[in-house]
């Protein structure tokens, strides 16, 4: 049976794990690192780079380097967070059927497609590590992700060629990794602050049960926002000093982003750091340099309100669970942004106790996802995971009211139904508008989709009985159905449109991904062939020069001709592996004659050396006589 991998698909970095021989292990990527940057780049040569290689070239290719794609996953263009992302991110965010997408060199990609490229790399790294094909996966999402964001994440997995067995919440996965071996029941809080999202979850763990009591968060708050505070400060300071606004310079902004991220990390251990960006821009007076020293206190002042938001959410979630802060035994810190000292200080202050830092904040979520995969496969038995829906679900009713069918915090999977009626006499159809959120009016909540129930028998208003049923699966993904109880006529909708992709589009993207996979493989083979050919050409040229006149003129001419043919094909960027291999083969054949000539020369030199050695022996004999004479003198 093939193994199940657990994937933490993060805003900034991603991580993959597998459950083997009774424990979850992090799978290193091909670069030897435990985490992979969630970055995808498109080069001018048509290459697609993923991970570290994509991140390294971001400064020189900012408009075609995609990072933080998770921030617009499943978002519609008219949402506030989408507009904020559009202002902040250097690449082009466009409208695709109402949903967010990115445009690179005239081609539109959905967030699902970009995320799929990261997932494909993680999948390939796992296959390389395990030595077998990997299909099944458990992927994590922020607890506060809505239905469309969860659906989009699952679609990304499908496009990447994965069978997504389960979508689980990141804090729940962390708790699963932390609490699996806990025998005594204890209430814990998982405070998860990552690169782009924030979640806090109250759970009860013990005796192989992990039960979510309450959850909350912000799907648009994380380390990126800390970076943005630093960026805004540096932009303002530079403008005040130089009079130049570099906000519109994408390359300068990318340099600034990387510098801000590094400054944030340095301030986690140092009391101050210096941002030094020479030649950031220029005007008629010459080049301009950005240099600014930032203290930890200054940085903490910038992010204080953001950290305060997380503490406010923390208080609300503990209250929603019906608990007091003193009821919490452990506070588990998850996510790279929990390394910021102010974050730890404020959370510690809220609980009045030391924080649990026993888990690796970058890896624990993937570890828990792998445990969940093992539970689904039956490799880990008697573990029960009870998760909850993060937001209430309902429909729009008369007067634009949101009528809730499933309250937030309901354990999933779950199914709830309620009977409604018509608003007008002889109404023959109703439109069901499915909503998610906590506000009283439909317009203030997120619409996940709508569908019609036709063929209702004519009757006075209030008489027809229409049963609406909500069914949430273990992934937190919703299906809604409506039935006219008089006629038995029914219709349903799996909320798929909310992610912006139809089943046909997903199928096409899966095929496109497979097609690109083959193209990438061919391109890599071509690069490997070029590298090998270049090494052979260099070695042949070196040997030619070293041997000089020892190579017969006619043989030298043949080798040089074959060498020039190979160099010519290497200059052609469109040359195929087969064309390169053919020229390498031709050069190798002629070079063999050269190496034979070189070998013959060495053998001849060996014979001469033998005679020389005999002569030397004679000299040695003479020297020996001299030695004897010297001895006699003594």
Swiss-Prot record:
Disordered: annotated segments: 515-536, 595-634
Q: Which family does it belong to?
A: Belongs to the heat shock protein 70 family.
General function of this protein: Acts as a chaperone.
Tell me which Gene3D superfamilies the record gives: 1.20.1270.10, 3.30.420.40, Actin, Chain A, domain 4, Substrate Binding Domain Of DNAk, Chain A, domain 1
The record ties this protein, via PROSITE patterns, to: HSP70_1, HSP70_2, HSP70_3
Gly residues: bias regions: 603-615
- Tell me the InterPro entries matching this sequence: ATPase_NBD, Chaperone_DnaK, Heat_shock_70_CS, HSP70_C_sf, HSP70_peptide-bd_sf, Hsp_70_fam
Q: What is this protein called?
A: Chaperone protein DnaK
What induces or represses its expression, per the UniProt entry?
By stress conditions e.g. heat shock.
Query: What lineage is this protein's organism placed in?
Result: Bacteria, Pseudomonadati, Campylobacterota, Epsilonproteobacteria, Campylobacterales
Q: Which domain of life is it from?
A: Bacteria
Keyword line:
ATP-binding, Chaperone, Nucleotide-binding, Phosphoprotein, Stress response
Residues that the record marks as modified (Phosphothreonine) are: 197
Q: Where is the composition biased (Basic and acidic residues)?
A: 515-528
Here the disulfide bonds are: none
